[in-house]
């Protein structure tokens, strides 16, 4: 049996934080605000996986109110989700995702992101796809106020 899931996330830019996307630190003049490392791509992927599993969402599994998750690497959360998948005997077929940011361009970093995400999920990096997209200056991403990310995942059981 196959199950599909969708994930979406947004974080706003702030001064004085590192920019972490797909577990990779990207040199940029500002970072994303959030309780964890605010890795908007990994959060969208986690929500897509949880969606496919029928397991609510990232905020319910890892509450903002918990000090355990303050400034935590979102890759740690992704590994937790990988454990849940294993417990349920579910396997990821593939992940596709889009990061929407006017700047920075992410394509120089997507191979490293794919490797990190695949490692956490114990899958091949060829099962993970990451695309970058601008909005041609339109909307909050275009004004460089924040970054959004979309992900879909197919899992089989
Ligand atoms: O040309 P089109 O409108 O389809 O795409 P775009 O948003 O102008 O982006 C052009 C190319 O830049 C994309 O195909 C990506 O390869 C790259 N890109 C990126 O790496 N990171 C982003 N945040 C946005 C775009
Ligand atoms: Zn998030």
From Swiss-Prot:
Gene3D superfamilies in the record: 2-C-methyl-D-erythritol 2,4-cyclodiphosphate synthase
Broad class of enzyme this protein falls into: lyase
InterPro entries: MECDP_synthase, MECDP_synthase_CS, MECDP_synthase_sf
Residues annotated for a divalent metal cation binding in this entry: 9, 11, 43
Electron transport recorded as keyword: no
Pathway recorded for this protein: Isoprenoid biosynthesis; isopentenyl diphosphate biosynthesis via DXP pathway; isopentenyl diphosphate from 1-deoxy-D-xylulose 5-phosphate: step 4/6
One of the Pfam families matching this protein, by short name: YgbB
GO biological process, any: isopentenyl diphosphate biosynthetic process, methylerythritol 4-phosphate pathway
Domain of life, per lineage: Bacteria
Positions bound to 4-CDP-2-C-methyl-D-erythritol 2-phosphate: 9-11, 35-36, 57-59, 140, 143
UniProt site (Transition state stabilizer): 35, 134
Names of required cofactors: a divalent metal cation
Catalytic function, reaction form: 4-CDP-2-C-methyl-D-erythritol 2-phosphate = 2-C-methyl-D-erythritol 2,4-cyclic diphosphate + CMP
Molecular function (Gene Ontology), one example: 2-C-methyl-D-erythritol 2,4-cyclodiphosphate synthase activity
CC cofactor note: Binds 1 divalent metal cation per subunit.
Quaternary organization: Homotrimer.
Similarity comment: Belongs to the IspF family.
Reported function: Involved in the biosynthesis of isopentenyl diphosphate (IPP) and dimethylallyl diphosphate (DMAPP), two major building blocks of isoprenoid compounds. Catalyzes the conversion of 4-diphosphocytidyl-2-C-methyl-D-erythritol 2-phosphate (CDP-ME2P) to 2-C-methyl-D-erythritol 2,4-cyclodiphosphate (ME-CPP) with a corresponding release of cytidine 5-monophosphate (CMP).
Protein name: 2-C-methyl-D-erythritol 2,4-cyclodiphosphate synthase
Protein's gene: ispF
């Amino acid at each position: 049996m196959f199950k599909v899931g969708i994930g979406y996330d947004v974080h706003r830019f702030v001064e004085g934080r590192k920019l972490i996307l797909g577990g990779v630190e990207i040199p940029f003049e500002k970072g994303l605000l959030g309780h964890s490392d605010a890795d908007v791509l990994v959060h969208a992927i986690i929500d897509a996986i949880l969606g496919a599993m029928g397991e609510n969402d990232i905020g319910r599994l890892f509450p903002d109110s918990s000090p355990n998750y303050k400034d935590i690497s979102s890759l740690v959360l992704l590994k937790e989700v990988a454990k849940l998948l294993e417990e349920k005997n579910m396997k990821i077929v593939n992940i596709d995702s889009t990061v929407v940011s006017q700047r920075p361009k992410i394509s120089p970093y997507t191979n490293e992101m794919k490797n990190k995400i695949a490692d956490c999920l114990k899958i091949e990096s060829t099962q993970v796809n990451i695309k970058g997209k601008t909005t041609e200056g339109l909307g909050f991403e275009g004004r460089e106020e924040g970054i959004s990310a979309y992900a879909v995942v197919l899992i089989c059981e």
